[in-house]
């Protein structure tokens, strides 16, 4: 099990990265038109056979393309606000070994709302000048029409308990969406907001069965990797074993509990309201619930919200004490730098640098 000091070091470093990135603006310049860029946002927590299936299908359809894996991100918390199993460096290493050409850093999803991180991802696709965007989806009745409208370039957006085509003024689907499908519509909305023409750019790949991220994480927590070996490619098994041996994994059961308890217990109303994702209801509830002795007490004091991930995201915001102003500035300039977490070889790296319009690139050290 990694030490608390290891996690504290990551948090401190990543908060500084966010602050530095927020203070810079992106730079754009001339670029080559080829090869085509396949930009895939996937959290890889961990990379399983479903992820490999989506990657291989995209590479099959665009055999000469450069496959760029966009891997979140600073603070190492996922879109649901939960800790990742491995650092983004390790997740990038798996992606490259499994077939990606380039891996770049995505946004700090765990301390953002879905609308915020979707804007960041859309900004990254624009900065990469993405030709293709592969996305896995789960088939449900009526969703094929949603996908068709998106690939026509329509502004298809998620609303509470329904999906709406704004261009046609039609409700396409009613009821809550499964997470993978929700991300597709949220991303399409964000791309439209930024004026990115996504007509015909999505490669929609039906998810394969027999894979459970929850089961994988539970098996890793139990120290029984072999129980889920059929769900994981050998590249994931190898890197995960290396990370565990080095004391850098698993991270998905770890929180900086003392920081969360302190930041839930001490700040006044104004200071809490300055934290990202906090509203008056959440801040007031945390103040009423004091004092706190355990992480569970803090979690139970956080009121429910429209998003079922609200509690975990709030815990992640408290953990790193992430302020609204920082996040807003970060989103405004994102990506101020394309941070390269891994690459296949030097020739691929040169092709990538020549191809994308963003001129400020940094290789992760």
Swiss-Prot record:
Signal peptide range: none
Protein's name in the database: Uncharacterized protein MTH_1126
Pfam families from the UniProt entry: HIGH_NTase1, HIGH_NTase1_ass
Family the UniProt entry places it in: Belongs to the TmcAL family.
Highest taxon, organism lineage: Archaea
Transmembrane region(s): none
